[in-house]
Amino acid sequence: MSLKDVKVNFLVDMATDLFMARSISEVTIKDIAIAAQVGEATIYRYFGSKQNIVVHAAMKIQGIVSKDFFNLEKGKNGFEKLKVFYESYYEIFIKHPDFYKFLSEFDAYVSVEDSSITNPYESAIDSYKNFYMDAYELGLKDGSIRKQNDIEMFYFSTTQALLELAKKLAFKKAVLNQDNRIEKTSELQCLIAIILQSLNNLWV
């Protein structure tokens, strides 16, 4: 790793910590420079803009998620692999709810920016779909998974539903009274159970 890479990683670490502690919209380049004890010009020299450092932070979080979760090798058959896949959303919520909070802010932040800046992040996210489809095909072959009419639609619909629910639950303040009556983790577990029931071809 070059000296430049070390410096970039350090600045991304500082920025990510600030984004997590506060919010993406509140943190400025000046804040990051002060935390890293460098000049603002250094931040701009390495990243060019706040938008780029935000994407780098998202990539860092994605790397942690990829390394620590979604280990589909744990599954013995196609269904068990997809069970690991969906339950990873729950495990992330338990261990890193701030990741979902960041993702919610990230989506809102980049929605008004040049979409091309998120291309590296989107490419990394696409790899999850490839793992998912491989597990699905294995499940069809070993008989553990029930065939879906449109598996791509099923994939996007279910993952988006889980993401949106997790992002909503990651914000501690309840919006509605009913939000106080339902255990946050139970909501995620319930949705995951419904999804898995749709896929499981081995129910007795």
Named regions from a protein language model:
Residues 19, 28-29, 39-40, 50, ...:
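Amphipathic alpha-helical segments enriched in hydrophobic/aromatic and basic residues
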Residues 91-131, 152-153:
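Short secondary-structure transition hinges
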Residues 91, 130, 134-142, 156-204:
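C-terminal peripheral helix-coil segments that are non-catalytic and often amphipathic
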Residues 70-98, 151-158, 185-188:
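Hydrophobic alpha-helical connector segments
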Residues 57-84, 99, 136-137, 141:
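Amphipathic alpha-helical linker/stalk segments
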Residues 15, 36-47:
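Short hydrophobic/aromatic patch on the recognition helix
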Residues 1-22, 26-35, 52-55:
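Basic, helix-initiating cap at the start of DNA-binding domains
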